[in-house]
């Protein structure tokens, strides 16, 4: 089994594409195993000490449909104690400036309450949003991607974030 489990939900393919880029940047499937949350169960989280959670913000500050179902039906069954968790999200900072990356913040708050330790915070500099549930202490709780308005920055942001995670996790 790989060292890292990456669990994501994707409706339009943008979050899935980011998940694949993150996996490649870490070194491929021998290091990071991808799990679509639509096909995952709570037991899939058991074999990993390090998790990456990816979710787009959907509608007006909501979880993506697959994450919404998992959040309501299975997330409470997982013991995140002893697990280190990083987050990334996709969203539209201009069209939804008042709730940019809210889904990432919703998941981070819930998983932290279940014992998960958050790593991988990301600066808010360079973004044009008004508010976000994913902001804590002047930073995002994870990597914020905007394929609608800043797609040209996605690759470099992922490279920088993965390097940061490797340093934080000493891998």
Predicted regions and their residues:
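A short beta-strand-loop structural module common to alpha/beta enzyme folds
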Residues: 29-41
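FMN-binding flavodoxin-like domain, especially the glycine-rich phosphate-binding loop
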Residues: 3, 35, 47-171
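N-terminal beta1-alpha1 ligand-phosphate binding loop
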Residues: 3-25
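Short helix-loop-beta junction
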Residues: 19-30, 109-113
């Amino acid at each position: 089994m790989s060292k890292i489990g990456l669990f994501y939900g994707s409706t339009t393919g943008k979050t899935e594409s980011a998940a694949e880029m993150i996996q490649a940047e870490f070194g491929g499937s021998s290091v990071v195993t991808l799990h679509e949350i639509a096909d995952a169960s709570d037991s899939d989280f058991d074999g990993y000490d390090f998790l990456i959670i990816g979710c787009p913000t959907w509608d007006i500050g909501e979880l993506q449909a697959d994450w919404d179902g998992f959040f309501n039906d299975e997330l409470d069954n997982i013991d995140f104690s002893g697990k280190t968790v990083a987050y990334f999200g996709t969203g539209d900072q201009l069209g939804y400036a008042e709730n940019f990356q809210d889904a990432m913040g919703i998941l981070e708050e819930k998983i932290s309450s279940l014992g998960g330790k958050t790593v991988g915070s990301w600066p808010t500099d360079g973004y044009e949003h008004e508010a976000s549930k994913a902001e804590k202490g002047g930073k995002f709780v994870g990597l914020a991607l905007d394929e609608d308005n800043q797609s040209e920055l996605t690759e470099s942001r992922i490279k920088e974030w993965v390097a940061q995670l490797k340093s934080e996790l000493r891998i």
